[in-house]
Amino acid sequence: MHLTSREQEKLMLFLAGELAAKRKARGVKLNYPEAIAYIASHLQEAARDGMSVAEVMQYGATLLTVDDVMGGIAEMVHEVQIEATFPDGTKLVTVHNPIR
């Protein structure tokens, strides 16, 4: 199987997001890379599931709370940006202040 660089990136993001989700489910507070991966992977899947850009942006702000991450992480994450594949093409999605 041959994967393009973009496909490899998406797969790595998915894998990091899955690891973060497992840690979150165990009650482990997420660090910076885990929080970004968790949010970004969920945004990718939401876009793939058919949500609109606006819906994905709103959804992204509901995924993590301050209690889900280590101290100071929420203040470090000002925005999360991904290129997501929607039914009508690839679009840039930005979620501002995603950890509330």
Swiss-Prot record:
Signal peptide: none annotated. It catalyses: urea + 2 H2O + H(+) = hydrogencarbonate + 2 NH4(+). Pathway: Nitrogen metabolism; urea degradation; CO(2) and NH(3) from urea (urease route): step 1/1. Its EC number is 3.5.1.5. GO terms for biological process: urea catabolic process. It comes from the Bacteria. The keyword NAD does not apply. GO terms for cellular component: cytoplasm. It holds the Pfam family Urease_gamma. Keywords: Cytoplasm, Hydrolase. Belongs to the urease gamma subunit family. HAMAP family: Urease_gamma. This is Urease subunit gamma. The gene is ureA.
